[in-house]
């Protein structure tokens, strides 16, 4: 247990809203490393995230250099190369009656192009997996985790990074591609990823090399008041 901070030390609504409104997805970073004390502050904030069933079953993989992130991305693209049959035309055609129209459209319109972008860009020396970020964190669960827990913890980490002037971006496409099959298991083992997990998110951090002056006004699909 610890003593709760005084209320006057907490941000007010306007400050919190300003932090959230200023956030833009940043994928271009200076080469400067994220200091160890800032990494610990991000983790300290993420540890405060609420969970469905205490104690937390959230796990975090930390890649704390551009070189580590490039190595992970290279291995991920090599792994995807061996799975290209998974998004081949013949396989998608065969699976359409089994998994339905919506899943077919998802794989045809998003997953297959994603494979091409990841693999093709890496062959050109461009990392579109984690963008050679100075820092990335992968939040994932265990077989017993509330599916929302890793996502909430990742969100807290992102906000903490933003509060210290770091650029951040959530990356959701890596996680589902390393969950199933023998090749995925070997990939996870190589990188010390302990469990499969229903939900998981990567967050990348770094000192931004781009500056935005405008934000995007976001809305929900619907808001129903009963």
PLM regions and their residue ranges:
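Acidic, surface-exposed loops and disordered segments
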Residues: 1-226
